[in-house]
Amino acid sequence: MATLSFVFLLLGAVSWPPASASGQEFWPGQSAADILSGAASRRRYLLYDVNPPEGFNLRRDVYIRIASLLKTLLKTEEWVLVLPPWGRLYHWQSPDIHQVRIPWSEFFDLPSLNKNIPVIEYEQFIAESGGPFIDQVYVLQSYAEGWKEGTWEEKVDERPCIDQLLYSQDKHEYYRGWFWGYEETRGLNVSCLSVQGSASIVAPLLLRNTSARSVMLDRAENLLHDHYGGKEYWDTRRSMVFARHLREVGDEFRSRHLNSTDDADGIPFQEDWTKMKVKLGSALGGPYLGVHLRRKDFIWGHRQDVPSLEGAVRKIRSLMKTHRLDKVFVATDAVRKEYEELKKLLPEMVRFEPTWEELELYKDGGVAIIDQWICAHARFFIGTSVSTFSFRIHEEREILGLDPKTTYNRFCGDQEKACEQPTHWKITY
């Protein structure tokens, strides 16, 4: 198998044409329709998926990495990102709720995403491309030899697959796999790429070494961020505006149970994220404490930095007293027994508890977003160590303009000696 190696230093020397094939740059705030009008017949499709055990909030982070890759591709050719349908996530455990093949529009505002990069839903891809076929699937993997000490280099090589493929050929020699729950989807070719580096490292390969019109990158979490914490990162993160119907549910809950509205809380939210540039600390937040208390697998997976329920309640009461707050909103994945114990210890706590009909409508992912939206508007927030759920709340509060001192806080383990608080990643416009 031919080796296709692109070292980071070489990638930096590549001279990309300054404009897309249509003669236009794609920039934040531009409509996808502006650049892609009439281009469906010639544009190429980028698809991706993530390791099945990874959760909702890590997958949102992978989207940001893939968006960087798409921006690199757009400098040379017309590409569009096909949004991977949601479903079959470990943390989505509500029984009797159909939670596969969920389009992104259930959770996010697609026009907002399209102001950053051109995106379409998977079913639109099927309609445009002529059927449920993906020309080339690349399974991303690490290097078998690992990273050796010395100078870090970014590279990508076509290599033999290290692990057994989760794809199998049918009698027509098409590849069958999970494909987001779409059983009719088939891959025409599957091969493995060893990658070490940021997402854009695979751009030369996609542009020069395959003519496939539709390309899927499986195990995309193996790619790193191009510019973590930079303007491009924040442009993409800001574009990930929650779906309006979920925000409205959260806003109604804030108003009814927490005496919180954007006007009263000094939060200047705008529907168009490209026009929303807020000075940090200018927003006050609602008159309540926001809490994310991760339990379940974190109890045994992160024993040192996750408190007991009693320890968590002591910290909550201390914060409420310090900040003169008499309301507390808690987002938690605690099992029923633990939740009942928490309620006894903290009877004044408020929680968003959907009815079965609401759960069926919003699904577990929508409920998680509502929880995050409410926590993001709190006067003061405290989260759980190394939880991506808490990380996403940090980012949302940064976008809304709340004081970082009220955002980057976490619970400490009961016996934890050095309780390092989360790093402040300042928003960049």
UniProtKB/Swiss-Prot annotation:
Known pathway: Protein modification; protein glycosylation
Binding positions for GDP-beta-L-fucose per the UniProt entry: 53-57, 292-294, 371, 388-389
Main localization (coarse): endoplasmic reticulum
EC number(s) reported in the record: 2.4.1.221
GO CC terms in record: endoplasmic reticulum; Golgi apparatus
Disulphide bonds in the chain: 161-192, 412-419
GO molecular function: peptide-O-fucosyltransferase activity
Location in or out of the cell: Endoplasmic reticulum; Golgi apparatus
One Pfam family matching this protein: O-FucT
Catalysed transformations (reactions): L-seryl-[protein] + GDP-beta-L-fucose = 3-O-(alpha-L-fucosyl)-L-seryl-[protein] + GDP + H(+); L-threonyl-[protein] + GDP-beta-L-fucose = 3-O-(alpha-L-fucosyl)-L-threonyl-[protein] + GDP + H(+)
Active-site positions on this chain: 54 (proton acceptor)
Broad EC category: transferase
GO BP terms in the entry: fucose metabolic process; protein O-linked fucosylation
Keyword set, alphabetical order: Carbohydrate metabolism, Disulfide bond, Endoplasmic reticulum, Fucose metabolism, Glycoprotein, Glycosyltransferase, Golgi apparatus, Signal, Transferase
List of glycosylated residues: 189, 209, 259
Alphabetical list of InterPro entries matching this protein: GDP-Fuc_O-FucTrfase, OFUT2-like
Residues of the signal peptide: 1-21
Residue numbers marked as site, Essential for catalytic activity: 396
Family per similarity comment: Belongs to the glycosyltransferase 68 family.
Function: Catalyzes the reaction that attaches fucose through an O-glycosidic linkage to a conserved serine or threonine residue in the consensus sequence C1-X-X-S/T-C2 of thrombospondin type I repeats (TSRs) where C1 and C2 are the first and second cysteines of the repeat, respectively. O-fucosylates members of several protein families including the ADAMTS, the thrombospondin (TSP) and spondin families. Required for the proper secretion of ADAMTS family members such as ADAMTSL1 and ADAMTS13.
Entry protein name: GDP-fucose protein O-fucosyltransferase 2
